[in-house]
Amino acid sequence: MTNIRKTHPLIKIVNHSFIDLPTPSNISAWWNFGSLLGLCLIIQILTGLFLAMHYTSDTMTAFSSVTHICRDVNYGWLIRYIHANGASMFFICLYLHVGRGLYYGSYTYFETWNIGVILLFTIMATAFMGYVLPWGQMSFWGATVITNLLSAIPYIGTNLVEWIWGGFSVDKATLTRFFAFHFILPFIIAALVMVHLLFLHETGSNNPSGLVSDSDKVPFHPYFTIKDILGALLLTLTLMLLVLFSPDLLGDPDNYTPANPLNTPPHIKPEWYFLFAYAILQSIPNKLGGVLALVFSILILMLFPILHMSKQRGMMFRPLSQCLFWILAADLFTLTWIGGQPVEHPFIVIGQTASILYFTIILIILPLASMLENKLLKW
């Protein structure tokens, strides 16, 4: 009798994805982040579901309902902080996952990569809407500032913003629809993840050398299941240390003040994981130009397959590109720092320099370095 694992219509899908999946034997810990992102998504959906049971999406009671969750619901404080800090862990894993893809040339799998970029956009939209829900000062003003950016779109901008708001300012209608979208989007993300995996398993995983590894593959289970479990334990440990010892470390104190449309906070800024994009937005004096730069700073990821000039896939044997990659990483850290600073000298100049460097490295310097490395191969 054949094994049910290999014959049952449903179980065999799981088998081909997580058990008998042929996997390159040399993939490093950088390949752990895919499974960690899956774990983060599950944590966020579960904690979010329990929070939604007690949350009310009304401007009068939203802030109080979050307070009620933290004070009166059994382990409500724990669920709330796991959800808030889980988002931070999600983005840490996300950025490392994307960085791994850039470093090792995983973007040559077009479909997998492009679905991944769409996933990144969707997750960013979900996180932004989730940040609005507690209805604190930074929630309200963050929502006002970011949605207002759409007014930069010529001709239809103002109408579009009022349509999204459901009125003439961020109010009850906005909060209700943001809650609805924040609830539904994680399930759309889960569906997109399935498509992401579907395309990945069409080609098989990349590996650190960037070479074809068909002759040297091992089954996913037990080798990589145990490796993923180790990663999951480390992620859970980090998350719980954050939640139980300093749950507000990555948050904004302004969000413990109920939203007040009559009082603007001195420095409006988003959560830390959006600061790099916010810095790029701020560094351009023109509103429409800033919005375009903001969108393009993420959309530029879709250009990587076109900009790939090297005859080698990854950067493992390309020291010049490696150097540029780490300069780009340092530049993103600089942008993140600048995004959290007030808009004044010298931060404006640093932000503008870092923004120009970001686009220049990706669009001009990296492709040129790749072409130079191709020439050096002939020596």
Swiss-Prot record:
Signal peptide from the UniProt entry:
none
This protein's GO cellular component annotations are: mitochondrial inner membrane; respiratory chain complex III
Annotated heme b b566 binding lies at H97, H196
For this protein, what does the record note about how its cofactor is bound?
A: Binds 2 heme b groups non-covalently.
Specify the protein's topology with respect to the membrane: Multi-pass membrane protein
The Swiss-Prot or TrEMBL record lists the needed cofactor(s) as: heme b
| Transmembrane stretches, start-end | 33-53, 77-98, 113-133, 178-198, 226-246, 288-308, 320-340, 347-367
Q: Provide the binding site for a ubiquinone.
A: H201
- Localization, UniProt: Mitochondrion inner membrane
Question: Which PANTHER family is this protein grouped with?
Answer: CYTOCHROME B
Task of the protein = Component of the ubiquinol-cytochrome c reductase complex (complex III or cytochrome b-c1 complex) that is part of the mitochondrial respiratory chain. The b-c1 complex mediates electron transfer from ubiquinol to cytochrome c. Contributes to the generation of a proton gradient across the mitochondrial membrane that is then used for ATP synthesis.
Quaternary organization: The cytochrome bc1 complex contains 11 subunits: 3 respiratory subunits (MT-CYB, CYC1 and UQCRFS1), 2 core proteins (UQCRC1 and UQCRC2) and 6 low-molecular weight proteins (UQCRH/QCR6, UQCRB/QCR7, UQCRQ/QCR8, UQCR10/QCR9, UQCR11/QCR10 and a cleavage product of UQCRFS1). This cytochrome bc1 complex then forms a dimer.
What is the protein name stated in its UniProt record? Answer: Cytochrome b
What's the gene? MT-CYB
